[in-house]
Every structure is written in C-alpha cells, then in structure tokens.
UniProtKB/Swiss-Prot annotation:
Entry-linked InterPro entries: Enolpyruvate_Tfrase_dom, Enolpyruvate_Tfrase_sf, EPSP_synthase, EPSP_synthase_CS, RNA3'P_cycl/enolpyr_Trfase_a/b
GO cellular component, one term: cytoplasm
Protein's gene: aroA
Entry-linked SUPFAM superfamilies: EPT/RTPC-like
Residues at which phosphoenolpyruvate binds: K25, G97, R125, Q172, R354, R399
PROSITE patterns named among the record's database cross-references: EPSP_SYNTHASE_1
Catalytic reactions on record: 3-phosphoshikimate + phosphoenolpyruvate = 5-O-(1-carboxyvinyl)-3-phosphoshikimate + phosphate
Protein name: 3-phosphoshikimate 1-carboxyvinyltransferase
Organismal lineage: Bacteria, Pseudomonadati, Pseudomonadota, Alphaproteobacteria, Hyphomicrobiales
GO biological process: amino acid biosynthetic process; aromatic amino acid family biosynthetic process; chorismate biosynthetic process
C-alpha cells in the first residue's frame, strides 16, 4: 500500500499570472463514453488526463473501443451503438464515481454480464440511485449490501423503456438513464424537477441522438430519448473545468494583492452557482472573451483580491455548485459575517462525507461553524488573524485536500493536509499551478 504524502500551505501574497486549466471532468467522461459508442472516429482536444477520467477510458477499451493519444489530443474508434463487447474482467473505476455510474447506465441494457469494482472510497458511495431505474428496465443486479460496489449487472435480452422521475437533483442519475436508453427500444423519458448540468443532453444531440426536451405545468424538465440512434464520431474541444477553477478563484480573491486570469473556463448556466454566489459576496470576477465552443459557453476569468461579506446561499442553487461548496467554505471563513449554505445533504455521499469533513477542517483551523444534516453555517471573521495551524484529514477526498491547501495560502498560520495523492484524481496540476501563480506550498 502506498504511503500518504502530507503537504503544507503557507500564507502567501500577490498571486499573479495566466493559467489554462485542464478540461472539464464531466465532459471528459461523457466524451469518452459517447466516442466509444459512436461509429467512426472521435477526436478529443483538452481531455482531462486525471486518474478518474483515464479509468473511464480503460473501461471503454475493455468493451471494444479503440482509444489512443496522439500528440496533444485523443482519438477514439467506437464500436457503434449497441455493439459493445462483454468485458473479460471487472471494470475497475478506482475513485471515479461519475465514470462508474455513467457506464453502469450505458452497459445495463446490454445482454451480458458486467462487474464493477472501485477503491475503498468509491465502494462506500451509494449506487442504488442508478441501480433502481436499471432494475425497472429489466437489469438483474448482484450488489454488496446496500447497493454498493463491487456489483455485477446482468443485462436483459430486451430492455424496457421507462419514464422515470428523478427523486434527487442528480445529473449522474439523469445521464445514466439517458445512456441506458441508447440501447433500448422505444422512448426513454427522464423527468427532473430542477435543472442539473446538461452536458449529456447537448452531447447526445451532437453525436446524432434524437432528444426532445419540454417543461410540464409544474416546471419540471422532461427529456425524451428515442432508442437505438445511429451515433457518429465528433471532434470535441473540452473547455476548462469550473469545479477545478474554483480553488484558484478563491485563492486569488483572498490572497492579498492578487490578480490572475484563468483561460478557457466553462461557464455553462448549470455550472456557475459558485461564481454567482461570490459576486453576491462582493468578489471581483470578470468574464473576458466570452465565446461558444462545441455548444458550451466559455470565457476567460479575471480575478482580483476582494473584500467579501457573508451571504445565504439558497438550496435551489445547490445543483449548480454542488462540487464547489468546499471552496465556498474557504471564502466564507475569511469573509465578514455569517455565510449560510442550505440544501447540501448531497455532500454527505461524495468521495467522503464532504459536509462533515469541511466542518471538521474549519474547526481544526479555528473557524467557528455549525454543521446540520443538510446545511453549514460559517462565521467569518473578515480576517486571517488567528486562523490556521491545523493538520487536516482529507478522507481520501481530492476536494477536501484542495480546499484546505487553499485555506492555508490565506490563514495566518500554515495548514497541513495528511495526503496530497488523491488530488490527481481530478486536478493533477493543482499544486504546480498554485506555485506558478506565486503560492507557497511545500
């Protein structure tokens, strides 16, 4: 077993420079999956080459897709929709919850046996939210108690199209069902009460699937997918990941005399809840050179040091920033006054109990906060004085690691995290980028 590698962040000043962050993780997973299903070749520029994404690539290769890297882009020769091969061994997703859940949806309706395994963290995460609709489609499942990994899917001879009301705001559940609908006769319908990230819908249309989207009288979103479409390979340019950019944005806002530009960041409306919240707190964040790339809105972000004030973040905003609450908690700790985050129970079933991990880390670093089942209240002091000095347990969670390294760049006293290795699952360049901008991490 590999040994943990602690690392410490120290109070920094004057972060400056331009950086271009790696591709969006959500779009990277989906590009590999749809490229692997399509006829012909798909060319992917800007793929996030993190451990999570590469595990999805390995899974698609195990089921017949040809995936190679050439120079700075990736080429996928897909199997054709409906033509995946049975994997000869279990698909190991490591820490990749998104990859595992989306591939479960994609492969569920295939009349074959597929086994999914993962690391200790992924094996604790709930899979029932994906397995329940697959069961309705006729998939038989052998799972560890409580619908956890390891698990095996036995696809039916002919899957049933379903009309499924997603019980929680989850782009992963929605996407898994839509991917299952690709190899299912008839019309598969997903009903989501609130908009979640919509990359799957956009990309399915781009690859040639027929989707119809409407609203019902209650305002819920109905997505109808017509089964057995002919998917054709595409050229994809993946914009930078706003969830990774979040920690750099927070660092630049809080470290004195900072002025940085993050180029080519995805600003899809379903992904900018954090930026909207930071604007309400008084943040100086500009969108420069706004443009569209592959149907997605993209901009360069200029961020300057700002004095922030506490706000209340409504629960309705949670789906558009669910991965960014750890970053927001850092901003809240140094803001003036109370910040209240509501409707965030989904944080409890991430790579760790992320809500608890954030609250513990804040308290260890002398920040007053209150943790509830579905909320977090942070009492900001408006100053770095007296804060920091903690040794933080990351719980094998990449976002907790980046959260408290960012905290340590601002606090009066250094902050040490117990292990930096898991940062590579989503943002391998994080520490080098912080150093490049002038941050002190060692």
């Amino acid at each position: 077993m590999q040994k943990a590698i602690p690392i410490t962040a120290y109070k920094s000043s004057s972060l400056s420079g331009k950086i271009r962050i790696p591709g969006d993780k959500s779009i990277s997973h989906r590009s590999l999956i749809l490229g692997g299903l399509a006829n012909g070749e798909t060319y992917i520029h800007g793929l996030l080459e993190s451990a999570d994404v590469l595990n999805t690539a390995s899974a698609m290769q195990a089921m017949g897709a040809c995936i190679i890297k050439k120079d700075d882009f990736w080429i996928i020769r897909g199997t054709g929709n409906g033509c995946l091969l049975a994997a000869q061994k279990p698909l190991d997703f490591g820490n990749a919850g998104t990859g595992a859940r989306l591939v479960m949806g994609m492969v569920g309706p295939y009349h074959m046996k597929t086994t999914f395994i993962g690391d200790a963290s992924l094996s604790k995460r709930p899979m029932g939210r994906i397995l329940d609709p697959l069961r309705l489609m006729g998939v038989e499942i052998e799972a560890t108690h409580g619908d956890h990994l390891p698990l095996t899917l036995y696809g039916p001879k002919m899957a049933n199209p379903i009309r499924y009301h997603v019980p929680i705001a989850s782009s992963q559940v929605k996407s898994a069902i839509l991917l299952a609908g690709l190899n299912t006769a008839g019309i598969t319908t997903v009903i989501e009460p609130v908009l979640t990230r919509d990359h799957t819908e956009k990309m399915l249309k781009a690859f040639g699937a027929t989707l119809e989207i409407e609203r019902d009288k209650e305002g819920a979103r109905l997505i109808h997918l017509y089964g057995h479409p002919h998917l054709t390979g595409q050229t994809i340019h993946i914009p930078g990941d706003p969830s990774s950019a979040a920690f750099l944005i927070i660092a630049a806002l809080l470290v004195e005399d900072s002025d940085i530009t993050i180029e080519n960041v995805l600003i899809n409306n379903s992904r900018i809840g954090l930026i909207e919240t930071l604007w309400e707190m008084g943040a100086h964040i500009e969108f420069l050179n706004q443009r569209q790339t592959g149907g997605e809105d993209v901009a360069d972000l200029r961020i300057k040091s700002s004095v922030l004030k506490g706000v209340t973040v409504p629960k309705e905003r949670a789906p558009s920033m669910i991965d960014e609450y750890p970053a927001l908690a850092v901003a809240a700790a140094f803001a003036e006054g109370k910040t209240v985050m509501l409707g965030i129970e989904e944080l409890r079933v991430k790579e760790s109990d992320r809500l608890s991990a954030v609250a513990q880390g804040l308290k260890i670093n002398c920040v007053d906060c209150e943790e509830g089942q579905d909320f977090l209240v942070v009492y900001g002091k408006g100053s770095a004085k007296g804060l920091g000095g903690g040794y933080v347990s990351t719980h094998l969670d990449h976002r907790i690691a980046m959260c408290f390294l960012t905290f340590g760049l601002v606090s009066e006293k250094p902050v040490t995290i117990d292990d930096q290795r898991m940062i590579a699952t989503s943002f391998p360049e994080f520490i080098p980028f912080i150093k490049q901008l002038g941050g002190k991490i060692a």
